[in-house]
A protein has these predicted regions:
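DNA major-groove recognition helix of helix-turn-helix/homeodomain DNA-binding modules
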Residues: 26, 45-60
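Alpha-helical DNA-recognition elements
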Residues: 34, 38, 49, 67
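Short, charged recognition helix plus adjacent turn
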Residues: 62-76
Length: 76
């Protein structure tokens, strides 16, 4: 699943409108909707704000698998 789909699911699961989340991020509803459509990249500072708000990890929002990061061995 893409991060923008996860953003939308989190918002809906928490019964929030795009306007409410946009206000949290100090942006407009129109601009926030473009995050959910994948038309604008999500800035890191917004990612951090959303992680704290929804109480999830950045890995979760970014759709990364649990466990060790790609390409890293245990011996590093």
């Amino acid at each position: 699943m893409y991060y923008y789909e996860i953003l939308k699911n989190l918002r809906i699961d928490n019964d929030k409108s795009q306007a409410e989340i946009a206000a949290l991020l100090n942006t407009t509803q129109t601009y926030y909707s473009k995050y959910e459509l994948g038309k604008h990249p999500l800035p890191i500072h917004h990612l951090i704000t959303l992680c704290n708000y929804y109480n999830v990890s950045a890995d979760y929002i970014l759709g990364l698998p649990e466990g060790r990061p790609y390409g890293l061995s245990k011996t590093r």
